[in-house]
Amino acid sequence: MGWQIASSRLTHDFSALPFKMKELTLLIKITPQVDGSGLRLILQNRFNHTALLFDELIVSHDEKMSDAKSITRGKQKQIAIVGNGAVHTDALPFEVIAGQPLYFRMRALQKQTYADFSCVYDETFYNAIMAGTKNAAPHLPHNWQARKGWFCISCLEVWTNKKTPIIELTGDSLAETGMIETGLIKQLLNQAVVVNTGISGNRLLHDAPQDGPLYQTFGQSLIKRATQSTDPHPHPIIALIGSNDLVLPLIDGQSAHELVTPGQYLAGVSQLKQILDDRRCPLILTTIPPFSPHVAPQQENILLDAQQRRLLINQELRRFEWVVDLDPWLLGNDGGLKEIYDFGDHLHLNAAGGMVAAQAIMQKLSQLGYEKSF
């Protein structure tokens, strides 16, 4: 018996765009990927200098919280998370079934600022809603095109006799939205745990631009994140990255001076591969998916150039056996995403697009022999 990660989603640095709440009620659905007889949470406050207090943290098997149990820390119901830190909650005996959602409600009675933020669009395995009052009884939303976000909860661990392998899904919003993650979890449930470290706006080569609060949430470059990771356990890492290296210069002034050539991108891929090889974490990289976002007329030539660089980069990436070619699945006749897989912005994937991308990734995992270890 031991503790095993059953669900994990990275909390992002929103210190440049913090949430200031007089009071807070959070309702979060998290679906464990491992069975267990007990649970505990990791609560993050890494991007806030001030401690956070939660006056209530409870868990239930249903959204109405009908069998709710208190989650404590140090046997106290009020939980403090130190500034720039993280805490484990106490262990709670509680039945956990892989694929069956758990519902967590958090309340804070005092005015606080929250900077550790996680979000999702696909509602299959995660969902959340927040309210700015302490006595709210919110209901989870059902709108796959709307962002659902929560604070502080980054990892659910369960007490189990199983040892389930970890697969990390990382990169940019193509990972973060949950569309591809959902497809992978559906195919790997009870075989492997998919953990998500995707960050919206993330790039392979460059850190977040600093010329706007939203841009500042885009995180450090994936190369830097891979270098600084403290995870000592080898595991496969699936990366969806590169779209923002090409597209961000179209919308952001600072990024316009960070145009990436195919040679620079491919050198960055080689560097990422070496970093992960040194960590004994096999890299499974996808080609850069098609994109055709709406741009102003004066930017059309810049967009065409970015699309051409995408084609040149992907042409070289296909030479590597550890690369998943998404173009046969996603590329439309107009050079952008197929309409049936388009989220609506000609850049991101809808649920159907996430499922076919996950299918392509699963085929590559099988070709590389990883299914034998699941």
Predicted regions and their residues:
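N-terminal secretory targeting modules
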Residues: 1-170, 175-182, 189-190, 297, ...
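Conserved acidic residues
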Residues: 100, 235-237, 321
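Conserved SGNH/GDSL esterase-like catalytic core that processes O-acyl groups on lipids
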Residues: 156, 163-270, 294, 348
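Hydrophobic/aromatic beta-strand patches that form the interior of the parallel beta-sheet core
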Residues: 168, 195, 284, 322-324
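Generic structural signal for well-ordered alpha-helices
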Residues: 269-273, 314
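A short helix->loop->beta-strand "cap" motif at the edges of active sites that frequently abuts
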Residues: 279-282
